[in-house]
């Protein structure tokens, strides 16, 4: 079906775990005719949750792509995970999407992962609309949820719909644009609905919220301001145009509501996607850089007449077709059996097949164009974040940032036959998942696997067994500690070796200084006048990059510091990049105990929903874990939300303790917050353990 690019909508469905993302997506696929039955998550039958682990656990683990059509518009959808351990899937999806639907649990409102994905969408300037889901559940409160969107996310919610009833009395919605009530017929699984007059007891509230809608929308357009001033109202088409404009500019976020599981509100959500979210030609201009000159900016126009440019945002292994590379096309066209340039690696890649995906189902296509999201078969060198383009139009698009792992496990093959298979399996899994890291412990020879959480690594081990038939012994999870420095020091260091054969000489003067948390490692050269030839300076940086991974105190990577190369000296014959690399390492070792080294540990933001009667016990347990309560919120319905900061080291196995404290009635979620200094008594314990 040929669709104009102005009628494309590339969207993601994002939310906290269990807010109902996948259920909402399944209803969208049913009502758009993409599938002829409703797949339920709790039955393990959701088409978008196709992995065995997803079916068994009832959660989304990997982002799944699909395409459907609504009101002559093509909607490319990516359903993303809600569990914090798989936040990389959200990150790379939002990087290539034009808009998003943020789904909220009508009872819990804004939850920790809701905040995380919201900030990720902010980072990429992704316009979004909100869907307050589960309005049929006990304790659902639409107005509290809207308030939380404002206070916890710092957003400007613009209410477009109001619920008619709540909990078991939830019947439908009031559309504030048309000022009509929409009532769904339950016997048709929500496929049929009717427009009716607004119930008289809700008319005043509807008018109140419509006035707020008109006030905000009219400011988006000069014509609308004049019309609103003259008539105190706006025609429906002009009102929609204004809401769309404000949404795309990020002035506000439209808020809709419903119950996906009860089949209410999904069609009007689809209308909202079409009416308010941008097409590829409505978003900010895409700017790339010249691979040979990073200062030279190149503008990309979203037109199929332009040269081909795309971003690879995901690589995965398919047991039937091999490696699949998912791309978003930003300009031009692409044909199967053609060749493209990987601009970052300056390598030509041949495309075997081109596929349109529906979760794990594949449809071969011969051509794709600007705005399309497709999977390519046959690429050998391309990884997540690489730019693909026409060979005569080299360009680099902005890469994605991936979070550092916070937890690690030691892993070793059970048998010698598993040894080689383990390496192959891990290399493929690491290639798929940029938040998964692998290294080898130099002393023990053990393979160390690092990830975003216990569940993340548990799934990886399970996939190794199922997909690669590898059996492995796995150690207990360990915290991925870090180290940093707290003082600035300058080090003069000379590396000299002249005992027979070719000599080595390099002299460096390096200033080491602490950085604010989150800044990682920075290197700067202030060499002027040729004190060190420029071809030797990368050797200094490389030496520091390598040695910082071993840390100072207990062998953990050193982070959040800057090294500035101030001065140095060289020898015409005996100097080399290697000599300067060794000099940098020597300077680092000399700096180690002079710069006030400290150990850092990952601190988690923990959110617990508990019945009020267990609140004291829950808070007491948090305090015993070196945690601190930072906020409490009354959910109503005898429930409280406790927000706390707790070291990850003290959160292993927490779910079992929480169940015991609350007789199984409390639940929690957590995500990485920051690194903080470890108390000295804990450092002493860690030294005994790791040194």
Swiss-Prot record:
Catalyzes the GTP-dependent ribosomal translocation step during translation elongation. During this step, the ribosome changes from the pre-translocational (PRE) to the post-translocational (POST) state as the newly formed A-site-bound peptidyl-tRNA and P-site-bound deacylated tRNA move to the P and E sites, respectively. Catalyzes the coordinated movement of the two tRNA molecules, the mRNA and conformational changes in the ribosome. SUPFAM superfamilies: EF-G C-terminal domain-like (SSF54980), P-loop containing nucleoside triphosphate hydrolases (SSF52540), Ribosomal protein S5 domain 2-like (SSF54211), Translation proteins (SSF50447). The lineage of its organism: Bacteria, Pseudomonadati, Pseudomonadota, Alphaproteobacteria, Rickettsiales. Belongs to the TRAFAC class translation factor GTPase superfamily. Classic translation factor GTPase family. EF-G/EF-2 subfamily. It comes from the Bacteria. Residues 6-281 form the tr-type G domain. The keyword GTP-binding applies. It is found in: Cytoplasm. One of its GO terms (cellular component) is cytoplasm. InterPro entries: EFG_II (IPR041095), EFG_III (IPR009022), EFG_III/V (IPR035647), EFG_IV (IPR047872), EFG_V (IPR035649), EFG_V-like (IPR000640), EFTu-like_2 (IPR004161), G_TR_CS (IPR031157). One of its GO terms (molecular function) is translation elongation factor activity. It comes from Wolbachia pipientis subsp. Culex pipiens (strain wPip). Its main location: cytoplasm. GO terms for biological process: ribosome disassembly. Coiled coil: none annotated. GTP binds at residues 15-22, 79-83, 133-136. This is Elongation factor G. Keywords: Cytoplasm, Elongation factor, GTP-binding, Nucleotide-binding, Protein biosynthesis.
């Amino acid at each position: 079906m040929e669709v104009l690019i102005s009628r494309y909508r590339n969207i993601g469905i994002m939310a906290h775990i269990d807010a109902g993302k996948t259920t909402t997506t399944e209803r969208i696929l049913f009502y758009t005719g993409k599938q002829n039955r409703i797949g339920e998550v709790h039955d393990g039958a959701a088409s978008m949750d196709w992995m065995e682990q997803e079916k068994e656990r009832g959660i989304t683990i990997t982002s799944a792509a699909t395409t459907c059509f609504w009101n002559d518009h093509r909607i490319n959808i990516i359903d993303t995970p809600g569990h914090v351990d798989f936040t990389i899937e959200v990150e790379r999806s939002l990087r290539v999407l034009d808009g998003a639907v943020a789904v909220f649990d009508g009872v819990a409102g804004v939850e920790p992962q809701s905040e995380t994905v919201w900030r990720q969408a902010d980072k990429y300037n992704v316009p979004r609309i909100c869907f307050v889901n589960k309005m049929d559940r006990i304790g659902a409160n639409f107005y509290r949820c809207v308030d939380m969107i404002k206070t916890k996310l710092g957003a400007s919610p613009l209410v477009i719909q109001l619920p008619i009833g709540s909990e078991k009395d939830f019947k439908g919605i009031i559309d504030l644009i048309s000022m009509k009530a929409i009532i769904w017929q339950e016997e048709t699984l929500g496929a049929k609905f009717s427009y009716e007059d607004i119930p008289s007891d809700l008319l005043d509230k509807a008018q109140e919220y419509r006035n707020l809608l008109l006030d905000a929308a009219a400011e988006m357009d000069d014509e609308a301001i004049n019309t609103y001033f003259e008539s105190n109202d706006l025609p429906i088409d002009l009102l929609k145009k204004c809401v769309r404009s404000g949404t795309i500019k990020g002035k506000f976020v439209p808020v809709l509501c419903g119950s996906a599981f009860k089949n209410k509100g999904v069609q009007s959500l689809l209308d909202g996607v079409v009416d308010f979210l941008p097409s590829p030609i409505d978003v900010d201009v895409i700017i790339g850089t010249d691979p040979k000159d990073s200062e030279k900016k190149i503008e990309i126009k979203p037109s199929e007449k332009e040269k081909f440019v795309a971003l690879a945002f995901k690589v995965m292994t398919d047991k039937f077709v091999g490696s699949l590379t998912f791309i978003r096309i930003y300009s031009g066209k692409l044909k199967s059996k053609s060749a493209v340039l990987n601009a970052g690696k300056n390598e030509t890649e041949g495309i075997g097949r081109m596929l349109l995906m529906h979760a794990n189902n594949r449809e071969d296509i011969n051509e794709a164009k600007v705005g399309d999201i497709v999977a390519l078969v046959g690429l050998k060198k391309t990884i997540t974040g690489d730019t693909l383009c026409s060979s005569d139009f080299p360009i680099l698009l902005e890469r994605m940032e991936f979070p550092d792992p916070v937890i690690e496990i030691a892993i070793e093959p059970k048998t010698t036959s598993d040894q080689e298979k383990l390496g192959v399996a891990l290399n493929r899994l690491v290639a798929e998942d940029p938040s998964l890291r692998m290294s080898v412990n130099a002393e023990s020879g053990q393979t160390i696997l690092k990830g975003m959480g216990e569940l993340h690594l548990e799934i990886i081990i399970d996939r190794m067994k199922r997909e690669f038939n590898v059996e492995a012994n796995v150690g207990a999870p360990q915290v991925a500690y870090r180290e940093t420095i707290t003082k600035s020091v300058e080090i003069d260091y000379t590396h000299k070796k002249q005992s027979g054969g070719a000599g080595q000489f390099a002299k460096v003067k390096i200033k080491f200084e602490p950085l604010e948390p989150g800044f990682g490692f920075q290197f700067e050269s202030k060499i002027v006048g040729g004190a060190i030839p420029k071809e030797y300076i990368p050797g200094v940086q490389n030496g520091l990059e390598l040695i910082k991974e071993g840390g100072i105190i207990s062998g953990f990577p050193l982070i959040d510091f800057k090294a500035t190369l101030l001065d140095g000296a060289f020898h015409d014959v005996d100097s080399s990049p290697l000599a300067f690399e060794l000099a940098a390492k020597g300077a680092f070792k000399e700096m180690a105990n002079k710069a006030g080294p400290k150990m850092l540990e990952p601190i988690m933001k923990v959110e617990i929903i508990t019945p009020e009667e267990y609140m004291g016990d829950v808070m007491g347990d948090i305090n015993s874990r070196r945690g601190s309560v930072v906020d409490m919120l009354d959910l109503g319905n005898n429930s409280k939300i406790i927000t706390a900061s707790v070291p990850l080291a003290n959160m292993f196995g927490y779910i079992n303790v929480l169940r015991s404290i609350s007789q199984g009635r409390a639940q929690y979620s957590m995500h990485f917050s920051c690194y903080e200094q470890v108390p000295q008594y804990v450092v002493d314990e860690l030294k005994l353990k790791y040194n």
